[in-house]
């Protein structure tokens, strides 16, 4: 992160970006994509994956998961028909409100939406042995839930950081998987507008702030 035009960094902690992405298209790969990929790895070999919150990270992860032959079930905030249609365009086999039940039990779920109340819902929709991965930095409080929805060797975990090997693997996979980032650019002076659009859930894909 950061908006300096020039910086000095240890090359051991830098990644080479794929050549076939313009700067704005590559920008979402470096946060949303990297953390999203680590969350996907944390989901293990799950075949049916639920994604709660279909924004910047989700629209990238969905493409990688589909390339890997997995099924994506997308959950958006209630009434977000545009977000659900976007998920279907990217290959989701089902898309619906976060309050809805998917047509099949999930092997894993990834939560990008910072809503603690979604954790019990994701657990209820997960098969025995399933994993629920919380990929956000912040989340509202998780409500009390019965042990029975965690029982059955279901697991609940969070994602906080990524490793260099995660980054190298993802940036190698992204062009092979044909990942296309959908971005809306804003000048840096319109950062507050971009944040408001993000909060309102009216962005399709990712917002990218341009310095120049």
Predicted regions and their residues:
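Glycine-rich cofactor phosphate-binding loops and adjacent beta1-alpha1 units
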Residues: 43, 73, 81-155
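Glycine-rich phosphate/adenylate-binding loop and adjacent beta-alpha elements
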Residues: 1-14
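Structural detector of well-ordered beta-strand residues that form the stable sheet scaffold
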Residues: 15, 50, 73, 131-133, ...
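Short beta-strand/turn micro-motifs composed of small residues
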Residues: 53, 76, 113, 136, ...
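Short strand-turn motif at the edge of the Rossmann-like AdoMet-binding core
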Residues: 135-139, 159-162, 186
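C-terminal hydrophobic helical "lid"/dimerization subdomain
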Residues: 120, 164-212
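Terminal helix/beta-alpha structural elements that buttress the NAD(P)+-binding lobe
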Residues: 48, 60, 70-71, 83, ...
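Mid-domain Rossmann-like dinucleotide-binding core that forms the NAD(H)/NADP(H) cofactor-binding site
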Residues: 19-99, 103
């Amino acid at each position: 992160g950061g908006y300096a035009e020039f910086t000095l960094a240890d090359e051991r902690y830098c990644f080479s970006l794929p050549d076939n992405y313009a700067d704005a298209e590559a920008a979402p790969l470096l946060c949303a994509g990297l953390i999203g990929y680590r969350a996907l790895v944390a989901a293990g070999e799950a075949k049916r994956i639920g994604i709660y919150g279909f924004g910047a990270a989700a629209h990238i992860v969905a493409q990688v998961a589909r390339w890997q032959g997995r099924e994506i079930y997308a959950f958006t905030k209630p009434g977000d028909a545009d977000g659900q249609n976007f998920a279907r365009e990217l290959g989701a086999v089902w898309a619906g409100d976060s309050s809805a039940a998917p047509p099949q039990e999930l092997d894993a779920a990834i939560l990008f939406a910072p809503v603690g109340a979604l954790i019990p819902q994701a657990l209820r929709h997960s098969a025995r042995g399933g994993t629920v991965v919380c990929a956000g930095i912040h989340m509202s409080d998780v409500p009390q839930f019965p042990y029975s929805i965690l029982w059955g060797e279901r697991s609940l975990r969070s994602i906080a950081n990524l490793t260099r090997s995660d980054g190298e693997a993802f940036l190698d996979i992204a062009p092979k998987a044909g990942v296309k980032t959908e971005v809306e650019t804003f000048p840096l002076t319109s950062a507050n507008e971009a944040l408001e659009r993000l909060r309102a859930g009216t962005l399709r894909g990712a917002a990218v702030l341009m310095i120049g």
